[in-house]
A protein has these predicted regions:
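Acidic, histidine-bearing metal-coordination/catalytic regions of metal-dependent phosphoesterases
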Residues: 1-20, 25-26
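Active-site neighborhood of phospho(di)ester-bond hydrolases with catalytic His/Asp-centered motifs
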Residues: 21-23, 44-50, 82-89, 110-112, ...
């Protein structure tokens, strides 16, 4: 899948290092992304979910093998700078064998966990889809590595695993959280002691138009938020950064909504 040349969106925030934020790559063309990263040379690269293009479970072979461009992107990123990856809803079916390949790229996988890096603490909150499907897989272990799950089963009980965040927010240092779903922010994250949160998921609201009521350009629809969502791009409360993403996964075109790489520079 080809992507148009992404725009480079720049935000200046209180942050110890310069960071690139990638989201919603969906196994597309890594070349324009890596070209931008090679030119900009961020100190850290973050991938906040939906690295792959998800599919219904049931095909033969590893899911990650169907997403070779995603693996290529991670290897390219890890060769440029320390790279940290969290899991979005499109990664829900990945098995431990799949995740082993993700780790083999040199990127650090953050699956409801955190690591320390140069005075920072970087965590990754996995999509609730991952937990739902892992539970389902255990209950249907005799049906292969990727037992098919009814969509109604997948979408119920959509609560991420939050317990580890209590320890995360008590860590010393600048706390950066990768969380694919921006709709988790008002529900679970706003009041936590987290310095910066990186999200994506909404593809910028698909169609973006100027709202005279709000005095800004806003998206039309986002999963998890519905029509005229509030959280589709930009910086919110000085701590939630949302990327419009790198790809499109639907036949509905993006209108007034270019793909983007977000660069965070420190004040």
């Amino acid at each position: 899948m080809k992507i148009n040349q992404p725009i480079e969106t720049n935000y200046t925030l209180s942050c110890p290092v310069n960071i690139a934020l990638l989201t919603d790559f969906h196994n597309s063309d890594p070349e324009p992304v890596l070209e931008s990263l090679q030119r900009r040379r961020p100190e850290i690269i973050t991938v906040a979910g939906d690295l792959i293009l998800g599919d219904l479970p049931g095909k033969k072979g590893l899911k990650i093998d169907e997403n070779r461009h995603a693996v290529e992107l991670l290897r390219g990123c890890a060769a440029l700078a320390p790279t940290f990856v969290s899991l979005g809803n499109h990664e829900y079916m990945l098995s431990e064998a799949d995740l082993k390949i993700v780790r083999s790229t040199g990127a650090t996988l953050l699956d409801n966990t955190h690591v320390s890096h140069q005075g920072m603490v970087i965590g990754g909150l996995s999509s609730a889809y991952c937990h739902v499907y892992r539970t389902f897989r255990q209950q249907h272990s005799g049906e292969g590595m990727y037992p098919p799950i009814p969509i109604t089963e997948l979408k119920k009980r959509q609560i991420p695993q939050l317990g580890w965040l209590d320890e995360f927010e008590q860590q010393d240092g600048f706390r950066l959280l990768l969380c694919h779903h921006p709709d988790y922010y008002p529900l679970y994250l706003r009041e936590r002691k987290i310095d910066l949160i990186f999200s994506g998921h909404c593809h910028g609201g698909q169609w973006r138009f100027y709202s005279p009521i709000h005095g800004e350009t806003r998206g039309v629809f986002a999963p998890g938020q519905g029509f005229f969502p509030k959280l589709t791009s930009g910086v919110h409360d000085g701590k939630l950064v949302i990327s419009k993403g790198l790809c499109n996964t639907t036949f509905i075109p993006r209108i007034n909504n270019p793909t983007e790489i977000v660069y965070i520079t420190n004040r």
